[in-house]
Amino acid sequence: GQWDELYYFLVIEELQRRQMYQSELDEELERAYHVLAEKFVSSDYTRFGKMLLDGFHNVRPGGRYVDFEVPDLEGNKVRLSDIIKGKIAVIDLWASWCMPCRAKAKAMIPIYEKYKDRGFEIVGVAREFKNTDRLKQAIKLDGYPWLQLVELDDGCRIWTQYMLGNAGGGVFLVDRDGKILAVNPKPGEVQKILEQK
């Protein structure tokens, strides 16, 4: 009844809070979600809760990256897996207003230039709000030579899927099979892995 639905809302709120603050997931909370998901199969809570749980379980070293489709700067839809399949890749989730994100990305430019012809790819995905004006300025100023995609107004909930909450961004190094090798690796770590592969 309505109490179950209210309880479901509270379970989802708690999952989201833990994701936002990058807290641990406990079995009891996950069990409560699964019981309620069976009861409310077609609920938006069920879909959102699954997205949150997938992030908890997958987005870590040894897990698999979460695929998505978002537009590039010209508005063409691009599926991430189409770009990085069979390559060692960095998925750079960033924002024009996140200066630490931009500094990390700029530090990757020499590595990208050195290894881009050897099966290495970087894909930037910028979390922007309202428009892409500041994003275009940042790309021009910082000189990123790789593909940039746009997550506008959290339309695809990529930050939620990647367990980033309200953070400006995150960097994910994945292998040729889509397995996450490192989260927020330093440029030296990326280069070391590329030299070994």
Question: Where does each model-flagged region fall?
Answer:
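Conserved beta-strand scaffold positions in the cores of enzyme catalytic domains, especially
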Residues: 122, 148-149
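Hydrophobic beta-strand anchors of alpha/beta hydrolase catalytic cores
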Residues: 90-91, 122, 171
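Structural microenvironment flanking redox-active thiols in thiol-disulfide oxidoreductases
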Residues: 103-142, 154-160
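Short, small/polar residue-rich loop motifs at catalytic or cofactor-binding pockets
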Residues: 64, 87, 166-168
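Thiol/disulfide oxidoreductase modules built on the thioredoxin-like
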Residues: 142-144, 151-196
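Oxidative protein folding and maturation machinery
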Residues: 1-78
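Generic structural signal for well-ordered beta-strand positions
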Residues: 78-79, 181
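Short active-site neighborhood of thiol/selenol oxidoreductases, capturing the structured segment around
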Residues: 79-102, 108
